[in-house]
Amino acid sequence: SLDASGFARRTKELLEIYPRQNALAQLNLMDSHDMPRFLSMVSGNKQAFRLATLFQMTYPGAPCIYYGNEIGMMGGREPENRAPFPWDESRWDHDLRNWFKTCAHVRQAHQVLRTGEFVPVYAEGRRLVILRHLEGVRMLIAFNADDSNWEIDIPVEDHFEDGTTFKDLLGGDGAVLEAGHLRKR
């Protein structure tokens, strides 16, 4: 398995293989009708699924959501992965659906997430921070795949001025850059 450093290196390499315009148009899938559903591959781990969804929505290219992922459909090998959509809303994971909606809304609302440069600025253990920037607009995306809470303390002085205030677009508390370090719980 990859740690955050290996993951950051590999995702950056994938972007460098193709011309920029091609990378921005690539179809980004977590799963499809030809493979087990992602949620099944991670044994129903919804936190891993949420992180993968956030990554999919913030990585360059066009995110493609396989039907049912947004409500937590499971499915291993064929034909389980091609089960019909469960229209009975009582069977849906509404929290997961709201997560998908929030991530998609944030992506749609911020051009920088669709066409900005992709720069890993922190990768240690199972924690990763990506900088997306475009025409003076900069956004940080933090991923914590560890089981413990993370007090973010990362040097980002090369990208932001001291005193810069950050808003958490996914509903958490904001953060402030102090002495060249971003600190957030």
Positions of predicted regions on the chain:
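Alpha-amylase-like alpha-glycosidases and glucanotransferases acting on alpha-linked glucans and related
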Residues: 1-63, 113, 122-125
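Carbohydrate-interacting/catalytic domains
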Residues: 44-49, 60-65, 69-185
